[in-house]
């Protein structure tokens, strides 16, 4: 469905406190400071951002060790370029990225889009640590991510807004959680029989959906102000039900609560496989829970979505924005 004409008003909206009962608490990787500095310098060396975007980017904080930081930075490079690209350009960029990841030893052209070299260097470093299973799953997940980014560009070029069910199908890949989870299992040897177990698959999908909701709640103001909110669940819900942004936020907050309860209930059903594998399974599942908290903390503590008011807004939950109601 294409967006209809809109009327603009200024309003204060309340961000739902979606993680009020989430048991995983905020914590920082002990190697974070050193990894963040090295990874930020690496990313800046590609000159992939405009000066204004680079200044904003440098204010952001990233969770995890060096490989995790590099992946987040690679996501930012991809977002910076594909968010304004046509479907055709996004496909070309996606192909460059995947060629670099599938064959990182192949020299990249100096005239090639910068994302190729960034992906190559990231993956060459990551493969030094990745187990074979994590290596394979990351490549598969990143292909799905890039394909979905191309689909997002196609939707944007047509001013097309999906319904809720169709949106989740695409967003589960554009959110970038699947390749991120593959990095979480970088040192783990989890066979397909584990990852394809119904409980593990359900926990993974529930976690992704919870992250989508948290991300879309926090990113909506910035995306809306830049006229790029078509790929956001708030817009999707507003468009489908003809309701206000606050009503849409409340709707998806209720959905978030239901999904979070399902995740915690499903957690009780984590299977046992025997021996050391059980510890690796628990490590992966705790990584899912931690990722939800990390995404929320980063959304407020970085300056990407709320500028210098992030911590204040995390407490008050109040944001002022210029609302365009698609009714």
From Swiss-Prot:
Q: Where is this motif: DDXXD motif?
A: 79-83
- Keyword annotations: Lyase, Magnesium, Metal-binding
Which residues hold Mg(2+) 2?
79
Record-level Gene Ontology MF annotations: metal ion binding; terpene synthase activity
Instruction: Tell me the cofactors it needs.
Output: Mg(2+)
**Where, in this chain's numbering, is Mg(2+) 1 bound?**
79
Give the enzyme's main class according to its UniProt record, as a single word. Answer: lyase
| Matching InterPro entries | Isoprenoid_synthase_dom_sf, Terpene_cyclase-like_2
Q: Where does Mg(2+) 3 bind?
A: 215, 219, 223
The record's EC number reads 4.2.3.135
Known catalytic reactions: (2E,6E)-farnesyl diphosphate = Delta(6)-protoilludene + diphosphate
Q: Name one Pfam family in it.
A: Terpene_syn_C_2
**Site annotated as Plays a critical role in the stabilization of intermediate cation: where?**
76
What is stated as this protein's family in its record? Belongs to the terpene synthase family.
What is the UniProt domain comment for this protein? The DDXXD motif is important for the catalytic activity, presumably through binding to Mg(2+).
Descriptive protein name: Delta(6)-protoilludene synthase HYPSUDRAFT_138665
Organism of derivation: Hypholoma sublateritium (strain FD-334 SS-4)
């Amino acid at each position: 469905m294409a967006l209809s004409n809109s009327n603009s008003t200024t309003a204060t909206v309340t961000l739902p406190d979606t993680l009020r009962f989430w048991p995983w608490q905020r914590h920082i990787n002990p190697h974070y400071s050193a990894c963040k500095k090295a990874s930020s310098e690496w990313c800046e060396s590609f000159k992939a951002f405009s000066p204004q975007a680079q200044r904003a980017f440098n204010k952001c904080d990233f969770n995890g060790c060096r490989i995790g930081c590099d992946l987040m930075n690679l996501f930012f490079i991809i977002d910076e370029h594909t968010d304004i690209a046509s479907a055709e350009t996004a496909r070309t960029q996606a192909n460059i990225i995947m060629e670099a990841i599938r064959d990182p030893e192949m020299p990249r052209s100096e005239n090639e889009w910068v994302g190729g070299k960034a992906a190559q260097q990231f993956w060459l470093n990551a493969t030094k640590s990745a187990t074979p299973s994590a290596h394979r799953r990351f490549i598969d997940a990143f292909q799905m991510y890039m394909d979905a980014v191309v689909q997002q560009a196609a939707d944007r070029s047509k001013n097309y807004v999906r319904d809720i069910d169709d949106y989740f199908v695409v967003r589960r890949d554009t959110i970038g959680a699947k390749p991120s989870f593959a990095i979480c299992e970088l040192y783990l040897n989890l066979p397909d029989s584990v990852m394809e177990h119904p409980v593990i698959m359900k926990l993974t999908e529930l976690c992704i959906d919870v992250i989508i909701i948290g991300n879309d709640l926090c990113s909506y103001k910035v995306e809306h102000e830049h006229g790029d909110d078509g790929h956001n669940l708030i817009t999707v819900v507003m468009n489908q039900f003809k309701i206000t942004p606050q009503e849409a936020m409340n709707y998806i907050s209720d959905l978030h609560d239901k999904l979070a309860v399902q995740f915690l209930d499903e957690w009780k059903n984590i299977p046992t496989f025997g021996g050391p594998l059980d510890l690796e399974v628990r490590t992966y599942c705790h990584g899912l829970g931690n990722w939800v908290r990390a995404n929320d903390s980063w959304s407020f503590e970085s300056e990407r979505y709320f500028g210098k008011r992030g911590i204040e807004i995390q407490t008050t939950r109040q944001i002022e924005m210029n609302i365009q109601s698609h009714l």
